[in-house]
Amino acid sequence: MRFLKWAIIFILFNSAFVESKEGYADNDGVEIFYVDYGPIDNEPILLVQGLGGQLTFWPDELISVLQDNGFRPIVYDNRDVGLSKNFEEYGRPNFVWNYAKFYLGLPLTSVYSLADMASDGIAVINHLNIEQTHLLAQSMGGMITQRMVADNKDRFKSYVLIASMARTPDLKTAPKGELRKLIEDRSFKNQSVDERVERSIEIFKILATPQTEFDEAAFREEVIKNINRSDNESGFSRQLIAILADKDRYNEVQGITTPTLVIHGKLDPLIPYEEGKKTAELIPNSTFLSVDFMSHLIDKPVMDFIEKPLVEFLEENS
């Protein structure tokens, strides 16, 4: 009887855990893996990850903040990453040729488009029978969702765009120096697990907010766990080509009527701050939140800073 009593208390105090579920949404034969954290009675918010990012990359603190304030986070693996359908049968793109075309300003051909990836997110909310949801996206996820929102205005109550831009990367906006080399290495090379872990550490150090406390041992463990979850290393390359093959989305974002909060860090080495600010200026009904100390990631110092304005924005548009 005492065990039953404590079991009931555990369930009551962990209702979000009990209500979470996972599964696959079908998008015309492309299976998209999702996790619905619940609770199901809360306001849904769809989160869309960046380049090569599995759904496990979302900070636990962000998920907790959303749940604690009455929201229902729903995350998913973009196509060609994590447990969603991979496109490994197409092989790794020829990056010598593709980078040459990119630097010459010539059009690129991708296996799938950002518009295709946007339709994956719509498939997830359709599968869950959600008519309207809030939307939060980071980096490449922001590029995907610009098309998602522009083409499906009636499906979104609000839109949070973090560390992204409406411009297609070019020579002016492409990453420079060591970050560019690390991205090229991931695009070109088949590397060992140890090499991939070391590369991930170097990328994190560049993209993380300077104030972030870095536990290297825990980070290594997390990287290995994600590699074990999905070893589709070439998906990063195909997603990158989809970004470079896309057109500027200036016209699309100017047509967005959904209330929008754009968040961008002044220290971002991947997506220039000026491009984030310009994107906010192009979206008619938007608010721009500048974070002086932020690099590219939503790490703890950034989460602590944006929590209040983020929650207030979502609540105002619920």
Identify the meaning behind each predicted range.
Residues 174-251, 278:
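Alpha/beta-hydrolase
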Residues 30-100:
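Conserved HGGG/HGGXW glycine-rich cap/lid loop of the alpha/beta-hydrolase fold
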Residues 286-318:
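Catalytic active-site module of serine/aspartate enzymes centered on a nucleophile-bearing elbow/loop
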Residues 103, 107-111, 115-133:
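Conserved acidic catalytic loop of the alpha/beta-hydrolase fold
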Residues 131-171:
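Conserved hydrolase catalytic core segment
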Residues 256, 262-264, 268:
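Short beta-strand/loop motif that positions the catalytic acidic residue
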Residues 269-275:
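Conserved alpha/beta-hydrolase "acid-adjacent" motif
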Residues 19-31:
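N-terminal cap/lid segment of alpha/beta-hydrolase-fold proteins
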